[in-house]
Amino acid sequence: MIYELFYPLKFHYGWLSWLNVLRYIPFRTIMATITAMVLTFVLAPWFIRELRRKQIGQVVRAEGPETHKIKAGTPTMGGALILLSLLLPTVLWADLRNPFVLATTAVTAGYGVIGYLDDFLKIKRRNSGGLPGRYKLIGQVLIGGAAVAYTFLLASKLPPDWAEIRTRLAIPFVAFSKYPIELPLYVYIPFAVFVVVATSNAVNLTDGLDGLAIGPVIINAGTYLILAYIVGASIASFSLATYLDIPAIASAGELSVYCGSVIGAGIGFLWYNTYPAQVFMGDVGSLALGGGLGMLAVFTKNELLSIILGGIFFIETVSVITQVLSFKLTGKRVFLMAPIHHHYEKKGWAEPKIIVRFWIISILLALVSLASMKLR
């Protein structure tokens, strides 16, 4: 919004030539990060007090770890604050004419609404049931599908590079120009929606300990910021993406501003969500943030790399699937409890140890993901 409103003024008033800085994505990304962080820090104390006053507290599962019983009543739905602190800076600093930005923010907001309904029902009923899974999944598929289809229908209005590679998959550590996976449009769109929905639910499953989910979300957003900028960056006629032999998508660079907003809001929230947490994000936060990460993977053509980058989320999801299948087929459990972070709790690991070690793994996976751009 600021870009569209103020940048044109420099052409009419010479003394406003300094507004030229708004052209640059790195500047607007930094400003979005700072704005999101400041918003979260300023609003969080009041927001947490209001959650306490309205008795919007965490409902703990009866079959959960014993150590979680003390968490009952801790303010939840803090993800609503993350959404506000994420979406407002994105609207302020990003180029809202960019379809990728519009689609990503729409999914973030839409998944946030689904998460809000889920949290609301949990609190109202005083149990961990929430919104029935089938309704949640239908909502995610419809919103994700609409956003993905929107960008594909507009392919002719986007730079030619997007129309050319939109249904191709980049294989990590493999030169994109030589060995892309070409999918038919009717196959790719459902696959892209699956990536978005799966990432959203994976982040939701990871959000079981204080700061466990938001840490990797920040790390993933920081990595996507770099990837989006490189994919969309072009200096004169030199394209860094072409040099690295990864997909080049000029419009994707604007997603860096969105990533900056996620990082800023995430850091601000982590200040209050770190162990012992003063507030939980709830499904309103985890589903929204996961949906946003899924859209980033699709629009930067890192659908397959997201398995490595979001390895923590992937492992958490696989642990749940493995546990359910094993119990149904054999009557035995592979883990003491799923998702896997609860398994380590049951083994006696201290909560901060689990959290920090998962963060470390997430950082290492982010470094591997970035290295994949050059190691081809």
Swiss-Prot record:
It is found in: Cell inner membrane. Catalyzes the initial step of the lipid cycle reactions in the biosynthesis of the cell wall peptidoglycan: transfers peptidoglycan precursor phospho-MurNAc-pentapeptide from UDP-MurNAc-pentapeptide onto the lipid carrier undecaprenyl phosphate, yielding undecaprenyl-pyrophosphoryl-MurNAc-pentapeptide, known as lipid I. It comes from the Bacteria. CDD domains: GT_MraY. It comes from Sorangium cellulosum (strain So ce56). One of its GO terms (molecular function) is phospho-N-acetylmuramoyl-pentapeptide-transferase activity. The lineage of its organism: Bacteria, Pseudomonadati, Myxococcota, Polyangia, Polyangiales. The keyword Ligase does not apply. This is Phospho-N-acetylmuramoyl-pentapeptide-transferase. InterPro entries: Glycosyl_transferase_4 (IPR000715), PNAcMuramoyl-5peptid_Trfase (IPR003524), PNAcMuramoyl-5peptid_Trfase_CS (IPR018480). Coiled coil: none annotated. Keywords: Cell cycle, Cell division, Cell inner membrane, Cell membrane, Cell shape, Cell wall biogenesis/degradation, Magnesium, Membrane, Metal-binding, Peptidoglycan synthesis, Transferase, Transmembrane, Transmembrane helix. NCBIfam families: mraY (TIGR00445). Its EC number is 2.7.8.13. Its cofactor is Mg(2+). GO terms for cellular component: plasma membrane. It catalyses: UDP-N-acetyl-alpha-D-muramoyl-L-alanyl-gamma-D-glutamyl-meso-2,6-diaminopimeloyl-D-alanyl-D-alanine + di-trans,octa-cis-undecaprenyl phosphate = di-trans,octa-cis-undecaprenyl diphospho-N-acetyl-alpha-D-muramoyl-L-alanyl-D-glutamyl-meso-2,6-diaminopimeloyl-D-alanyl-D-alanine + UMP. GO terms for biological process: cell division; cell wall organization; peptidoglycan biosynthetic process; regulation of cell shape. Belongs to the glycosyltransferase 4 family. MraY subfamily. It is an enzyme of class 2 (transferase). The chain crosses the membrane at residues 28-48, 76-96, 100-120, 135-155, 179-199, 211-231, 252-272, 279-299, 307-327, 353-373. Pathway: Cell wall biogenesis; peptidoglycan biosynthesis. It is a multi-pass membrane protein. Signal peptide: none annotated. HAMAP family: MraY.
